[in-house]
Swiss-Prot record:
KRAB domain is essential for transcriptional repressor activity and ability to inhibit endothelial angiogenic sprouting. Not required for nuclear targeting or for DNA binding. Zinc finger region is involved in nuclear targeting and DNA-binding. Its main location: nucleus. Belongs to the krueppel C2H2-type zinc-finger protein family. GO terms for cellular component: cytoplasm; nuclear membrane; nucleoplasm; nucleus. GO terms for biological process: angiogenesis; negative regulation of sprouting angiogenesis; regulation of transcription by RNA polymerase II. Keywords: Angiogenesis, Cytoplasm, DNA-binding, Isopeptide bond, Membrane, Metal-binding, Nucleus, Repeat, Repressor, Transcription, Transcription regulation, Ubl conjugation, Zinc, Zinc-finger. This is Zinc finger protein 354C. The gene is ZNF354C.
Length: 554
């Protein structure tokens, strides 16, 4: 198809790049299609403004910027035209156009069209023949494929611009006079082929205009945007402005799209469904993230360590490990965190909130992971096994800490006294010896402790609570460590081995006492007789026996 545009003297107007729908068709569009329409129209308008073309803001753009539905009037081409399709026009009159001569040579016929005094003068016999060709091709493949399959070129020669799209698109939808502006666009008349008008969104996206560059720059951070609307939305990050308010819960948002997504929480609407597992979501972005669970795709990679992530937000949080950045600070204790979720979990320490309850015993937890680990006590599930001694654990962190007994690893070292620990909790408690910090006080006896767990253990002395029970003999203990040591009686496990003679013990305290045999260290003496003893318990037993305590007589 060869096209010659003669006498193209008129500048581009917004009407040239606008698309209009009838009220009836607008109501049949879903939210995603309406959002696409708004995006394309606002971007086309912004692009024309960036070209420096002087014109006032159209009513349609004002409505779209305010988040309103565009007002449209449907008009039909008179029935005697026999074109068989509808045309949607703006309520204002059509602009005047110069003559347009169109040559159709693929089948040896010539078509001429002219626009005089603001009216379209069309050779209708050829138009009907051309429409039938379109319908035949539509039956073979969808409109999107039709557009993709045709070669599209834009060539410029002086003041004349030609656009070649092939025969699948009606000529008037592709060609409008312009003055030396190399941009793609849709004219003031937008045709729908048949009743499947939703496919026209593909056509609309195809003709979206991009004059090049990002002319709209943020004065705060220097970021640039193609559309002024996007710049305005971005600036709300700096100003904190949130103009969109939810009528249900009064929560506010900086973007209208965020408000629409949020409102689906109240309505329960989940229009986006995963074809793999049938799981549904309230917004498309969440569905896209979810699909990566099935595909295993991790498109976001850390430049520092090469670790990959399925979500950009997860990468952002991860990168703060390298930078040391901690944006989220606790208002109670000034402790800072690198992500908001960790701050929320931490704040439950101050509020005492425990939203996760065990259905078996009613015990509450501040974290879901803690509840999941606790529930394994009821089910008896032991997921993690030590390869050295075969011992099983309900938590992987407990297994890692346990394995340090075998390896002797002590990664946590005190900067004050250089003492090392194999558990962070033990290291954290030790540090408070140097600082003298004791935040947690027992209300019964006034004794203070450096950490909350020590206070809880201490309070069991007053309450007599023994929550840890042996599955073998039923004996109960106030501390989990006591239960662990007791279970070694049944298993015969002896973790603590003397490096001098190879003798093994079930308890660390027994190993420590044994080591004094090799060092000949005798710390405990009876003042009356001066007899030395290796451990205090031996001294106590000897004193009772010497004084005639019947409990220790053989």
């Amino acid at each position: 198809m060869a096209v010659d545009l003669l006498s193209a003297q008129e500048p581009v107007t917004f009407r040239d790049v606008a698309v209009f729908f009838s009220q009836d068709e607008w109501l049949h569009l879903d939210s995603a299609q309406r959002a696409l329409y708004r995006e394309v129209m606002l971007e086309n308008y912004s692009s024309l403004v960036s070209l420096g073309i002087p014109f006032s803001m159209p009513k349609l753009i004002h409505q779209l910027q305010q988040g309103e539905d565009p007002c449209m009037v449907e008009r039909e081409v008179p029935s005697d035209t026999r074109l068989g399709f509808k045309t949607w026009l703006e309520t204002e009159a059509l602009p005047h156009r110069q003559d347009i001569f169109i040559e159709e040579t693929s089948q040896g016929m010539v078509k001429k069209e002219s626009i005089k005094d603001g009216h379209w003068d069309i050779n209708f016999e050829e138009a009907v023949e051309f429409e039938s060709e379109i319908e035949e091709e539509q039956e073979k493949k969808p409109l999107r494929q039709m557009i993709d399959s045709h070669e599209k070129t834009i060539s410029e020669d002086g003041n004349h611009t030609s656009l070649e799209l092939g025969k699948s698109l009606f000529t008037n939808t592709a060609l409008v006079t312009q003055q030396s502006v190399p941009i793609e666009r849709i004219p003031n008349m937008y045709y729908t082929f048949g009743k499947d008008f939703k496919q026209n969104f593909d056509l609309m996206k195809c003709f979206q205009i991009y004059p090049g560059g990002k002319p709209h720059i943020c004065n705060e951070c220097g970021k640039s945007f193609k559309q002024n609307l996007h710049l305005i939305e971005h600036q709300r990050i700096h100003t904190g402005e949130k103009p969109y308010k939810c009528n249900e819960c009064e929560k506010t948002f900086s973007h209208r799209s965020s408000l629409l997504s949020h409102q689906r929480i109240h309505t329960g609407e989940k229009p986006y469904k995963c074809n793999e597992c049938e799981k549904a979501f309230s917004n498309s972005s969440t569905l896209i993230k979810h699909l990566r669970v099935h595909t295993g795709e991790k498109p976001y990679r850390c430049r520092e360590c090469g670790k990959a992530f399925s979500q950009c937000s997860t990468l952002t949080v991860h990168q703060r490990i390298h930078t040391g950045e901690k944006l989220y600070k606790c208002g109670e204790c000034e402790k800072a965190f690198n992500c908001r979720a960790k701050l929320h979990r931490h704040q439950r320490i101050h509020t005492g909130e425990k939203p996760y309850k065990c259905s078996e015993c009613g015990k509450g937890y501040s974290q879901f992971t803690s509840l999941a680990e606790h529930q394994r006590f009821h089910t008896g599930e032991q997921l993690y096994t030590c390869l050295e001694c075969g011992r099983t654990f309900t938590r992987i962190v407990t297994l890692i800490e346990h394995q340090r007994i075998h390896t002797g690893q002590k990664p946590y070292q005190c900067n004050e006294c250089e003492k090392a620990f194999n558990q962070y909790s033990s290291f954290n408690e030790h540090r408070k010896i140097h600082t003298g910090e004791k935040l947690y006080t027992c209300e019964e006896c006034g004794k203070a402790f450096g950490c909350k767990s020590n206070l809880y253990r201490h309070q069991r002395i007053h309450t007599g609570e023994k929550p840890y029970q042996c599955n073998q003999c039923g004996k109960a203990f106030s501390q989990y460590s006591f239960l662990t040591e007791h279970e070694r009686i049944h298993t015969g496990e002896k973790l603590y081995k003397c490096m001098e003679c190879g003798k093994a013990y079930s308890y660390r305290s027994n190993l420590c006492r044994h080591k004094k045999v090799h060092t000949k260290e005798k710390l405990y003496k009876w003042k009356e007789y001066g007899k030395p003893f290796i451990c205090s318990s031996s001294l106590t037993q000897y004193q009772r026996f010497f004084k005639g305590d019947k409990a220790y007589e053989v």
